[in-house]
Amino acid sequence: MTDTGTLFLNQQDVIDAGAADVDWVGAVLEQVFKLHEEQAFTAPPSSFLKRPECPHVADRIIGLSAHVGAPFDREGMKWIASSHINPEHGLPRANAVIILNDPVHRLPIAIMEGALISAMRTAVVQALAARYLARPDSESVGLVGAGRIGALTLWAISKWFPDIQHYRAFDQNAGRLQAFVEHMGTLDITVEPVPCFQDALSEADMGIVATTESEPYVTASEFKRGALFMNVSLMDPTFELVSAADKIVVDDWHQSVHSDRVLARMHREGLVTRDSIHGEFGAVVSGHIPGREDPDERIFWNPFGLAIEDIAVASAVYDQALSKGLGKTLRLVDQEWDVLF
């Protein structure tokens, strides 16, 4: 292999390559979950940089690396940083960079803006989960957390569930909630702002939490019969809510219980085991276990978020960028350093 350089893709390049297309990203992610079920990937535990003087659960940097098998056959890392105070300063809560390497020579073939890929795969995974786990006749969606992930998630769901009648949202910041409602209106999604999280979730066929809360507060009273509860964020649901579920579905069992999120805490206390959950989502997508079987069952969906999702989407973006002539080629090395000695 000849070193052809490293393709640099900024956010607009990533968008132009297809990463903002819900259907395109969804097709990639469906493949990813089938590969996960086949164990056609390698993904070590995430690396967390967490400083003791910054105790908030959202204040950290995470390195997620993975190799994803064919048809992608690429490896790489997402380096994603987050600060819970950023929105107060007009900055995005999270930012990310993704590096792709070829799987044989390990040369860096691409460096790309990763926040959009990270946000889109997070949102589209929820829409994909809804396809398999929500009632097909769902009419209402409730959201807690009027941020970018929440907006993208509602947008993705609206693409695949056009018959949704009611969207309700709550956020502790009234100004942010109003801005969220106005923004969603520009996307032809009418969102009703509500005064408390209970009003957003208690009657929702799909309940979504996408916040940076560090303590649980959502109870089983906000998890109605027949609902799908999507635990997109960190610590919002109580043990009681999780225990009320008829089925618990995770993206990856090992990752889910080796964290500090609600399911991991329940596992450490012996309240949730591998045998007590319904299974991993890849098994559902592959048809090895059923998704929703009963219109009245309550399903708790716990997506940890997987590096293979990021690397697969980034790999597909890279291929599209090459075919469309997007980005700029960088030369990281003009000559090997050892020629200097």
Can you annotate each of these PLM segments?
Residues L133-S140, D163, K224-R225:
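Short helix-loop-beta connector
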Residues A146-G147:
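Glycine-rich Rossmann-fold phosphate-binding loop(s) that bind the pyrophosphate
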Residues D13-A19, V242-L340:
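Adenosine-phosphate binding glycine-rich loop
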Residues L187-L271:
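Rossmann-like adenosine-cofactor binding region
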